[in-house]
């Protein structure tokens, strides 16, 4: 594999070979496609160097074979009946590299402006300042300890990559292995930086949002949204920066899989760890506060209340940001891997991927800058901004497709279909989770008959809610496939990858909406703890309700985007596996036959992994929450005056934060390692065919479970809030107690297991692609 990679990216300028790392080939003939001037005589040996992409070179080599007769798996080429053609547009690709870095700089500058704007807003309430500081310190403590654990994992993983990837170090080129390991570390580092800064801005924004709510919804919305937008801009900017830099420096899209694996491994642990933390605190606070003691949700007497607010940030800001960073990088990486394997216009397709990503970031910047609350309230403002961003993106990409030579309207159609289906999935998710829609009201009414009916109805509607999203993913993949299939071999799967790029093109706006949720959720609690009055709390409640609705929509969107991404990653896996198979002189993979025992073996194992992964995370929440509930009981029983709320008596908040932190870090590692180990074991047993089946089973099972759990949890959450607003007897009623039970069940569904599954799917897909050459060389039944 490494030998073949050493000849994939060869710099030829004016017929002169740049001699860096060399590979000598026997090529029957080689001539310039444009001028017809021979570059090497028929039947001669020709030396190509590696180290840079093919730029400004177009050449023709009949049959494209080595002297040994092995097929050359050029990533920029395709073997036609008449020969092997490679075509490159140097100036166009260079333009989009430059525009990528320029747009990233604009995004970072705008994020810095928003950060400074939020920081300038006044905060004067001493109690709010005190609690905000506790939340900030708790979040920083968790992030520091989590990143320390992840750093150790990253170092071990980087060493493994250095030794084995893209091919065992003793069989290949050490430079490629070093590049892959560095790219992996860069992926983890950029994701971690984006998450850390996002937490900083979120904890800065919450208190200011609470105090601004005294003046009304509009100023509070603007602070909360702009605080979240900093995270959105950083995530997309860092992902585009990393992808462009890695491809520019190495010229090898396969190295991007290492960068993407770094992002996805951090996302897996950040989302799972943050989810366990936040739901440990949330479940414990609800059970002891609302159910046992009957005290309000954000009552400062509850020892878990600060941990609950910390969890909102580490789970929904850092965790979801890392999740969508991973999805965005994986979508671009898979599209670029496939683009470089296409014939004739490979670099036009590479340019198209970058162009669409740039315009998506630009459209998100416009959408963020123009977001305002109108007469219809904050939910409408968030949705309107998303729709505006979508329209701007579609218009800009259509103009670019018309202007740039080599851009295809079929590929634009695939990207447009992906984005539009993503928006539609968001709308259907909203229907099942919004407390103004009939489904939530039906579950609330069922709660009047007891908690069993709350749980049963929520599970039922949760499964039904998966239907439109699954069908939407299937339809978008099918349309993208059929749109691009006439363009030639390999373009159909490229169309699916561009549908994923299209769906994630406005991810800057999506993350901004999602990060807004925990900021206003914290603000609502701070308004109550700071004694800002009922009118301010009502304004904060309205902002929080919009945040809950949008968070549910965002989760549906991110899961659906991951679905399309992993389908395209399956195509990238086939491309990488075929390179290794060609190098070994073995039959290439054209598909996966379900009747094959090795494929079916992979399907069954792959299908059960998401279920086991989910169970491990939910059990982690269960065990951790039991420890925290015991700690809360201890404090209420041992700290005199705490239960009565006597002045000057405070709970030991740090004890609950420590339980949530240590427990989440202890529970997240086994679940993540289980997924990776299962992939490796299946690969060594059945080879590439078994891995293909494994990925198919994992994708279908994982998407279904993720959508079900995310939507059912969001439904139960908003059912509880709907009753708390006065429906079905209001707070303290039997309906409310039943709804709290439903919400307690749904919390780890929607914020721990559900959104972590899509990251798990991405991780195993990337592990499969990265280890494809190893599985070809070392497997029992392939």
Annotate each predicted stretch with a short phrase.
Residues 1-12, 25, 30:
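N-terminal chloroplast transit peptides
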Residues 28-32, 38-51, 60, 64-782:
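Hydrophobic packing and interface segments
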Residues 14-22:
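Intrinsically disordered, low-complexity regulatory segments in eukaryotic proteins
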């Amino acid at each position: 594999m490494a030998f073949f990679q050493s000849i994939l990216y060869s710099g030829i300028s004016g017929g002169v070979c740049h001699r860096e790392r060399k590979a000598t080939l026997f090529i029957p003939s080689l001539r310039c496609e444009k001028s017809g001037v021979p570059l090497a005589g028929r039947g001669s040996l020709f030396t190509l160097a590696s180290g840079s992409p093919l730029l400004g070179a177009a050449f023709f080599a009949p049959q494209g074979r080595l002297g040994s007769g092995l097929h050359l798996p050029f990533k920029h080429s395709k073997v036609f009946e008449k020969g092997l053609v490679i075509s490159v547009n140097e100036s166009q690709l260079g333009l989009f590299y430059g525009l990528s870095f320029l747009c990233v700089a604009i995004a970072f500058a705008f994020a810095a402006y928003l950060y400074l704007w939020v920081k300038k807003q006044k905060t004067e309430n001493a109690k709010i300042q005190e609690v905000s500081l506790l939340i900030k310190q708790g979040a920083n403590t968790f992030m520091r300890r989590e990143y320390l654990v992840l750093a150790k994992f990253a170092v071990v993983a980087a060493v493994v990559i250095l030794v084995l990837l893209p091919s065992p170090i003793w069989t290949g080129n050490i430079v490629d292995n070093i590049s892959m390991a560095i790219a992996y570390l860069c992926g983890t580092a950029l994701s971690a930086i984006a998450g850390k800064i996002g937490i900083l801005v979120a904890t800065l924004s919450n208190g200011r949002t609470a105090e601004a709510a005294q003046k009304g919804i509009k100023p509070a919305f603007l602070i909360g949204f702009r605080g979240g937008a900093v995270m959105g801009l950083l995530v997309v900017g860092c992902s585009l920066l990393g992808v462009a830099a890695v491809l520019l420096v190495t010229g090898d899209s396969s190295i991007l899989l290492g960068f993407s694996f770094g992002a996805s491994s951090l996302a897996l642990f950040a989302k799972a760890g943050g989810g366990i933390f936040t739901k440990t605190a949330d479940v414990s606070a609800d059970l002891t506060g609302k159910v046992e003691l009957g005290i309000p949700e954000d009552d400062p007497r509850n020892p878990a209340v600060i941990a609950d607010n910390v969890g909102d940030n580490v789970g929904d800001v850092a965790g979801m940001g890392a999740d969508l960073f991973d999805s965005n990088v994986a979508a671009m990486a898979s599209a670029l891997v496939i683009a470089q394997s296409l014939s004739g216009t490979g670099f036009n397709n590479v340019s198209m991927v970058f162009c669409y990503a740039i315009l998506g970031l630009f459209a998100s910047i416009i959408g963020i800058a123009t977001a305002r609350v109108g007469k219809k309230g904050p939910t409408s403002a968030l949705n309107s901004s998303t729709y505006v961003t979508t329209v701007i993106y579609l218009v800009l990409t259509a103009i670019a497709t018309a202007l740039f030579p080599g851009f295809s309207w079929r590929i634009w159609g695939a990207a447009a279909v992906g984005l539009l289906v993503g928006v539609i999935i968001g709308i259907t998710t909203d229907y099942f989770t919004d407390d103004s829609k009939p489904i939530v009201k039906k579950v609330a009414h069922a709660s009047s008959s007891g908690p069993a009916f709350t749980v049963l109805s929520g599970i039922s509607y949760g499964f039904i809610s998966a239907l439109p999203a699954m069908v939407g993913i299937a339809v978008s993949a099918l349309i993208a496939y059929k749109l691009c299939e006439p363009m030639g071999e390999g373009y159909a799967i490229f169309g699916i990858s561009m549908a994923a790029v299209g769906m994630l093109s406005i991810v800057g706006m999506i993350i901004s909406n999602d990060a807004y949720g925990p900021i206003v959720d914290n603000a609502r609690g701070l308004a109550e703890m700071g004694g800002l009055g009922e009118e301010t709390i009502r304004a904060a409640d309205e902002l929080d309700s919009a945040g809950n609705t949008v968070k549910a929509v965002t989760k549906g969107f991110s899961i659906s985007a991951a679905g399309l991404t992993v389908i395209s990653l399956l195509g990238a896996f086939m491309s990488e596996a075929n390179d290794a198979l060609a190098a070994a002189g073995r039959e290439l993979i054209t598909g996966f036959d379900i009747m094959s025992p090795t494929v079916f073996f992979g399907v069954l194992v792959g299908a059960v992994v998401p279920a086991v992964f989910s169970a491990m995370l939910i059990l982690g929440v269960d065990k951790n929450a039991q420890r925290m509930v015991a700690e809360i009981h201890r404090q209420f029983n041992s700290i005199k005056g705490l239960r009565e709320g006597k002045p000057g008596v405070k709970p030991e908040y740090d004890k609950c934060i420590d339980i949530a932190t240590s427990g989440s870090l202890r529970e997240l590692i086994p679940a993540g390692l289980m997924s990776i180990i299962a992939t490796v074991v299946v690969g060594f047993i059945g080879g590439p065919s078994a891995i293909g089946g494994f990925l198919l089973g994992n994708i279908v099972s994982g998407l279904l479970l993720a959508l079900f759990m995310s939507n059912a949890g969001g439904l139960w959450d908003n059912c509880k809030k709907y009753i708390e607003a006065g429906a079905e007897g209001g707070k303290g009623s039997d309906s409310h107690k039943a709804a709290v039970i439903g919400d307690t069940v749904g919390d780890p569904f929607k914020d721990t297991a559900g959104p972590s599954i899509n990251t798990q799917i991405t991780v195993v897909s990337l592990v499969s692609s990265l280890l494809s050459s190893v599985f070809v060389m070392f497997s029992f039944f392939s």
